[in-house]
A protein has these predicted regions:
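Short, glycine-anchored, charge-dense loop/turn motifs used at functional sites
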Residues: 74-81, 193-203
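Vicinal oxygen chelate
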Residues: 3-13, 26-50, 93-102, 133-138, ...
Length: 245
């Protein structure tokens, strides 16, 4: 409806989030969770209390061997959070769980994503059968964690959690689009699903300026043009914004 909030961008502990009003079709799952590294126990208890309120406890907040004080919960909106004591300032790091058909493919995914986006692997903890119990990596300077889970789970990746990066021009958008949708799937409005089922988006500063312009009529034209396409075409959206298409 006109006047309803569609998107909002916020920063939590140095991690940028873009929230979308996507409707009931977008249901989050623990396949992607967010690891909150807290500065001290007081902060940890407060964060846990807020996130766990009216939520679903997956692992109670307590002391675990090798993990220390740790808890895992789905908040009241269904988003999944791992809360633990960190060593420095509070941080939030996305965590990707590879289970079921993806079990054992975490290292391959890291290698592919680094080849596409640029980055590096930061740590490796091996588990059973030489799988990745946990591994840290960076994509374009952003920290992520991935783990192979041997357990059978009923959940998988959904569009409720996706990763997005800003790209400066159409050439970069095209390269990433072709790489991620190869053996994957194309979705409307610049969304991509890779061959592991993880969802990605390509964003551009100009695109955001057009679709969020204070000139509501121009913004509407740009947004409607974007809704018509799968891969983002900056030139076509700009023409719609300028009224020249």
């Amino acid at each position: 409806e006109i006047g309803d909030l569609l998107t909002i961008t916020l920063e939590l502990a140095g991690c940028e989030f873009l929230l979308l009003n996507g409707g009931d079709d977008f249901s989050p799952s623990p396949a992607i969770s967010y690891v909150v590294n807290c500065e001290n126990e007081e902060q940890l208890l407060n964060v846990w209390k807020q996130l766990n309120h009216d939520g679903e406890t997956l692992m109670p907040l307590t002391d675990y061997p090798e993990l220390g004080k740790f808890g895992w919960t789905n908040d009241r909106y269904g988003f999944s959070w791992q809360v633990r004591l960190g060593e420095n300032l509070q941080t939030i790091i996305p965590c990707i769980m590879f289970a079921n058909n993806n079990y054992g493919l975490a290292q391959a995914a890291i290698d592919e994503w680094i080849a596409i986006f640029g980055g590096k692997q930061t740590f490796v903890i091996k588990g059973k059968e030489d799988r990745l119990r946990a591994s840290g990596f960076q994509l374009r300077g952003h920290d992520l964690i991935i783990m192979d889970s041997p357990e059978k789970h009923t959940f998988t990746f959904t569009m409720a959690n996706s990763f997005y990066f800003y790209f400066k021009d159409q050439t970069d958008i095209d390269k990433v689009w072709e790489a991620l949708t190869y053996d994957g799937k194309e979705w409307p409005c610049g969304w991509m699903e890779d061959r592991y089922g993880v969802f990605w988006q390509t964003l551009n500063k100009d695109l955001l300026n057009w679709t969020n312009s204070s000139d509501s009529e121009k913004a509407r034209h740009a947004t409607q043009e974007m809704y018509k396409m799968k891969k983002i075409n900056l030139a076509q959206i700009k023409q719609a914004f300028d009224g020249t298409n």
